[in-house]
């Protein structure tokens, strides 16, 4: 049997307590909140948030207005920089160069024209080639088919009857160091070149040598081994013209190019 609860532990409610509970809903506990009060509080909180968001958006939009942008220091700096750049461009187009600058540029152009038309530089068609190198080439000869065992002293002794020799150069391979089989001989005067050319097709160390005047190497022009100068563009044009003018040769029916024997009608070009 459970003990009976006495009235001393749970006294009956008084009238004062009942009046307090009826006037104060919080004293009644969680179940005392009415639906009407809950629904009334929720919209009020949402309206406050919406009002705050509207205020923030209106504040940000107000910053983009021209009046507020003009008050911003960054906007003023960028605007001043743009104005300064425009002012510089306008004055650069309007204001001419000072007379001293124009006079100096004109004098420099005239000096360059005089230098190009002077008698000393008329013979040099390419200003990029040094004048000393051109003069040395005019006093030099090319010697081809030289024996690999020949020395500079032997070449100097062989060409010494033609005139005074300043320099003998034997070209060697830069990787192996072996001679390439040709040399250049520089004389003291141009008249010695004509005498050296007479030794063309003579025998030096048991080999027939080739002696020709040396030609200056200019930029943009290729030269063969004494085969003459020709530009790259002219050689390409000649090749294209020759390939277009050639007519294809037709092979008789039944003949084809085989591996073992070439057809007499086949031409690689």
Curated annotation (Swiss-Prot):
Gene Ontology cellular component terms for the protein in this record: cytoplasm; nucleus
Coiled coil (residue ranges): none
Chief location of this protein within or outside the cell: cytoplasm
Membrane-crossing segments per the record: none
Record-level GO BP terms: maternal-to-zygotic transition of gene expression; negative regulation of protein ubiquitination; negative regulation of SCF-dependent proteasomal ubiquitin-dependent catabolic process; nuclear-transcribed mRNA catabolic process, deadenylation-dependent decay
Top-level taxon of the source organism: Eukaryota
Compartment list: Cytoplasm
Gene3D superfamilies documented for this protein: 3.30.70.330
Keyword Transport: no
Annotated region (Disordered), positions in chain: 26-54, 240-269
Keyword Ion transport included in the entry's annotation: no
Function, in words: Binds the poly(A) tail of mRNA.
Protein's UniProt name: Embryonic polyadenylate-binding protein 2
Taxonomic source organism: Rattus norvegicus (Rat)
Gene from which this protein is expressed: Pabpn1l
């Amino acid at each position: 049997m459970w003990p009976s609860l006495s009235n001393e532990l749970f006294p009956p409610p008084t009238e004062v307590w009942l009046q307090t509970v009826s006037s104060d809903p919080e004293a009644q506990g969680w179940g005392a909140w009415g639906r009407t009060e809950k629904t009334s509080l929720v919209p009020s909180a949402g309206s406050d948030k919406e009002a705050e968001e509207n205020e923030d958006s209106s504040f940000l939009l107000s910053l983009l207005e021209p009046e507020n942008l003009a008050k911003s220091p960054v906007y003023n700096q960028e605007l001043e920089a743009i104005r300064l750049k425009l002012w510089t461009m306008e004055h650069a187009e309007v204001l001419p160069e000072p007379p001293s600058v124009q006079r100096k540029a004109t004098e420099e152009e005239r000096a360059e024209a005089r230098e190009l038309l002077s008698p000393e530089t008329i013979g040099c068609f390419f200003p990029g080639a040094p004048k000393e190198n051109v003069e040395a080439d005019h006093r030099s000869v090319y010697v081809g088919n030289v024996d690999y065992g020949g020395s500079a002293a032997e070449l100097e002794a062989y060409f010494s009857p033609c005139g005074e020799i300043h320099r003998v150069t034997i070209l060697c391979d830069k990787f192996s160091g072996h001679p390439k089989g040709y040399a250049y001989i520089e004389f003291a005067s141009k008249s010695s070149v004509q005498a050296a050319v007479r030794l063309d097709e003579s025998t030096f160390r048991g080999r027939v040598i080739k002696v020709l005047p040396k030609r200056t190497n200019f930029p943009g022009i290729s030269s063969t081994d004494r085969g003459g100068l020709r530009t790259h563009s002219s050689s390409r044009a000649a090749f294209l013209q020759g390939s277009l003018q050639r007519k294809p040769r037709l092979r008789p029916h039944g003949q084809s190019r085989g591996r073992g024997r070439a057809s007499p009608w086949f031409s690689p070009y």
